[in-house]
């Protein structure tokens, strides 16, 4: 909502997309380091540091008088967000037992859907009575309340003692070289051959990383934890995040551009996805008592396949789209929550925090890959079932089929 105003006020021109790019790069850099920090510092200190970074970044964004300052501020804000997003996957394990953990993680996972309604309403209200700077200032009192709650509640008796092991500099360096190559391949739009070469180099670096980390007593990336089940979960989460971007980013665009709905109206159409997400997680322990893990996963992938195909056929009635999104919400609700819990429960207690940090990174990389791929597909003016959104959801359908095959063969 505020991008046109920011672009004009700060003379950003075609560089306006850096507002998102800088934030995302910082977020991805911060994600994996959280696990290492938690092995050396109490979680309460890491959480406060993340909130302070986010608050300082938000404050600086609001004070920005030029585009360079805004981008630097977004990087700081992104670092704070990266820390907090990783903690959102770790804290439920320390604080709650199953089945309550399912409910909490369902609420956490569906926050984006709730924000799709609150965001346009709140943002539009702020821009109606104030300048875009207050879109950032509003984060500060919220962060202060969060810091108070962290100080009050983040005391976990099961938290491990602080590690004294040597820092794995080589593993960290190789890992961030790998991430840098992946990010370049995702963000570069000049010479596509460089993207391909970057992916090839990333694979080579990843192989070196796995070889090195196998022989380190306290590795930055605990590769020994990646058994068949954990590896399958990471792949599933990466692909599911790609699919979620198809729904999260481009169904609202379709509703507004093709069907003429307002941002608030499109948010209301999408909201049933979040309701279904939360509802399923509140009843997940009952479902698991009757069905096996494999069966529920396969049902979830099937629901995602069915919902994407139905919308791909070009339905234009918002009420019907909202109903179909309930199916997608049930699918995403199970996959995301169960993936998180599997990593929490099936990795060793000593490495759980690191693994959950990398899990969060996988989710964010999937979101980045998804937004890029789905953006290209949405821009295509013809497809299997028609233009724009239908290309996006056709890709979701293909990925859903791939996930079904993956779980049938490897689980």
Go through the PLM ranges and name each one.
Residues 64-65, 97, 153-157, 186-190, ...:
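Short helix-capping/hinge motifs at transmembrane helix termini and TM-loop junctions
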Residues 50, 171-177, 198-201, 273, ...:
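Hydrophobic alpha-helical transmembrane segments of polytopic
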Residues 3-6, 91-92, 126, 154, ...:
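Hydrophobic alpha-helical interface/terminus motif in multipass membrane transporters
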Residues 61, 150, 182, 187, ...:
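Structural signal for membrane-spanning alpha-helices in multi-pass inner-membrane proteins
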Residues 1, 11-14, 20-22, 32, ...:
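12-transmembrane solute porter fold
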Residues 44, 101-113, 163-173, 224-229, ...:
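Cytoplasmic-side transmembrane-helix entry/capping segments in multi-pass membrane proteins
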Residues 129-236, 243, 269:
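Hydrophobic transmembrane-helix bundles of small-molecule transporters
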Residues 1-152, 299-305, 309-313, 319-330, ...:
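Transmembrane-helix bundle of Major Facilitator Superfamily
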